[in-house]
């Protein structure tokens, strides 16, 4: 068994001692000593879910969840139904954070959970899983690389690593589950990462869901744990359950067929390809291969490929232009007007396409707008406020409000600007 200290040292130079278990308040169920405890435990640092059939006599897989704002309960609830059904312990951090000035914040958050998991539960040290969203998705992959051979899978939502795929090249014991909302501003980044995984022959899945930059719904999160269980069988981490594998294959073939019949050809092809990768050779896999090949010969599928390629190119172009536009705005001697900034960002055209475009162009425009909104309503105003440039910060927030009403962090930044530099004319407002 690998000691706590060995695992901890591999995830950062900072060393500390924590006694987490004593802080947990138990409310029902059974703990490792067979005493009355909770299946949903909570401490100051994390929430825990333990399956009701937990028994310390065997080893259990565990999922560590890193929410980008430390919303432990929200994130844990998404995985809880599948964790109960499939037998996963889930720990969800209250200390994880994206966009932090502290580079070690997620190292500490993860190590806190890792220490507690080894101290308090009987876990399978070869079946550690990590789930992250946005910036914490990138952290999850980096931790998996450092703990290769221990981390058996990563759920990466709404963001992707810039590398790391070759650390797991041809590794059947590792699984990469990627997901993104259809209007997520990091949508293309997530797709590109799975292409790199495919090239490196890393087992992967890619799922899209309706919505913006966010955690997926419960069914997608549960699907990730189901797939991890399947990959654990295929990778030799657990004994193969032929009945469960056959049942899972049945459901996936039915789902792929349903996607095709509803006109979701690209989704059907993607699932058929995943089926072909994830199951041992059998006559039923030939069904998937033939069905996928038939779709790929259809003219409408070829047209879809061409159009999505064009839209991806446009997305990439905008992602490269946006920093240059921001640089122009920040360095102009006279603060550019809201109209001038909006024109450079092509907001009028993008807003029109987002409401009047077709099923491909509308989501593509919404993704670009979402990326622009994140920059104008959070990242850049925060930086400008730190630099004391309140006029430019307010102007950026004004343009952001043309994309969508200011909420949450955008409102907090606007209030900070107005507090430190009261507006002398009409200013943007919060919804």
Model region roles, listed by residue range:
Residues 14, 26-61, 112, 252, ...:
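A domain-start/cap signature at the N-terminus of enzymes
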Residues 118-120, 126-174:
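Primarily recognizes the serine-hydrolase "nucleophile elbow" in alpha/beta-hydrolase
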Residues 153-226:
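The feature captures the conserved acid-bearing segment of alpha/beta-hydrolase catalytic domains
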Residues 52-59, 101-134, 145-148:
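Gly/Ser-rich "nucleophile elbow"/oxyanion-hole loop immediately N-terminal to the catalytic nucleophile
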Residues 233-234, 292-319, 417-428:
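Alpha-helical linker/edge segments of TPR/alpha-solenoid repeat scaffolds
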């Amino acid at each position: 068994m690998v000691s706590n200290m060995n695992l901890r040292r591999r995830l950062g130079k900072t060393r500390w001692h924590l006694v987490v278990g004593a802080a947990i308040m138990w409310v029902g169920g059974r703990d490792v000593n067979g005493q009355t405890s909770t299946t949903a435990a909570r401490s100051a640092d994390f929430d825990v879910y333990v399956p009701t059939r937990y028994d310390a006599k065997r080893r259990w897989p565990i999922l560590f969840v890193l929410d980008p704002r430390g919303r432990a309960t929200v994130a844990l609830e998404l995985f809880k139904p599948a964790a109960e059904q499939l037998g996963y312990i889930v720990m969800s951090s209250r200390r994880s954070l994206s966009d932090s000035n502290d580079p070690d914040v997620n190292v500490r958050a993860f190590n806190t959970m890792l220490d507690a998991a080894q101290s308090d539960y009987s876990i399978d040290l070869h079946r550690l899983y990590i789930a992250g969203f946005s910036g914490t998705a990138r952290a999850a992959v980096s931790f998996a690389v450092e703990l290769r051979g221990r981390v058996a899978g990563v759920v990466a939502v709404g963001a992707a690593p810039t590398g790391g795929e070759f650390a797991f090249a041809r590794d059947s014991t590792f699984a990469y589950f990627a997901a993104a909302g259809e209007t997520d501003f990091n949508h293309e980044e997530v797709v590109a990462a799975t292409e790199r995984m495919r090239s490196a022959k890393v087992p992967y899945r890619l799922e899209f869901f309706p919505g913006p930059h966010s955690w997926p719904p419960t069914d997608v999160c549960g699907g990730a744990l189901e797939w991890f269980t399947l990959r654990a069988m295929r990778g030799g981490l657990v004994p193969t359950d032929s009945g469960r594998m056959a049942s899972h294959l049945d459901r996936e073939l039915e789902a792929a067929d349903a996607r095709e019949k509803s006109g979701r050809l690209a989704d059907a092809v993607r699932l058929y390809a995943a089926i072909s990768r994830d199951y041992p050779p059998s006559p039923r896999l030939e069904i998937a291969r033939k069905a996928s090949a038939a779709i790929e010969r259809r003219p409408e599928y070829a047209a879809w490929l061409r159009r999505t390629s064009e839209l991806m190119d446009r997305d990439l172009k905008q992602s490269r232009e946006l920093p240059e536009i921001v640089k122009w705005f920040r360095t102009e001697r006279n603060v550019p007007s809201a109209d001038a900034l909006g024109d450079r960002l092509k907001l009028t055209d993008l807003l029109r396409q987002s409401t009047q475009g077709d099923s491909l162009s509308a989501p593509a425009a919404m993704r670009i707008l979402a990326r622009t909104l994140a920059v104008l309503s959070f990242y850049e105003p925060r930086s400008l406020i730190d630099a004391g440039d309140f006029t430019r910060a307010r102007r950026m927030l004004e343009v952001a409000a043309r994309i969508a009403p200011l909420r949450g962090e955008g409102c907090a930044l606007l209030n900070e600007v107005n507090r430190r530099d009261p507006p002398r004319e009409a200013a943007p407002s919060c919804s």
